């Protein structure tokens, strides 16, 4: 596989099980927003990773998460990569870590989750992408980083 020595991917130090970027230099640094970025472009690109619908359901009503969305909206290229699919949202809470006896008590429905995700795109300008798995999300993150790195590099050369 090709190595991209000019691109150093920043992994937030709080990321507990980070993606492996074997073809890139990786630096672990505390990011103000998001879980991943590109060294030297930390104010331009950020990727927030969400592992499960349960994680989204837990975050969705928290003021702290709204603050994250507002910070993400300040980036030129803000992304939320979802390590699950649309079908997982539509079936929620099936497949979640919530005990079955609690399902009737939850107030967060698939419709509520989807409404909020659409708002993240429309209100905040954040690219929200269903990736179906962690592996797919990592692969997509690599493509995003390459594309944005070279797009920004070309833009600087034209200045």
Q: What spans do the regions from the language model cover?
A:
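Extended, alpha-helix-rich binding/interface surfaces that flank or overlap catalytic cores
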Residues: 27-33, 37-159
């Amino acid at each position: 596989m090709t190595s991209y020595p000019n691109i150093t991917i920043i992994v937030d130090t709080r990321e507990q099980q980070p993606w492996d970027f074997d073809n890139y230099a990786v630096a672990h640094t505390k990011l103000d927003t998001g879980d991943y970025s590109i060294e030297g472009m930390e104010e331009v690109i950020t990727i927030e990773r969400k592992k499960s619908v349960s994680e989204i359901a837990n975050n969705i009503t928290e003021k702290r998460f709204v603050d994250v969305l507002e910070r993400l909206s300040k980036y030129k290229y803000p992304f939320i990569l979802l390590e699950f699919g649309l079908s997982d949202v539509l079936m929620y809470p099936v497949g979640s870590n919530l005990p079955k006896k609690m399902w009737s008590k939850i107030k967060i429905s698939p419709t509520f989750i989807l409404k909020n995700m659409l708002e993240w795109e429309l209100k905040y300008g954040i690219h929200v992408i269903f990736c179906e798995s962690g592996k797919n999300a990592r692969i997509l993150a690599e493509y995003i980083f390459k594309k944005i790195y070279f797009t920004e590099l070309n833009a600087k050369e034209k200045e």
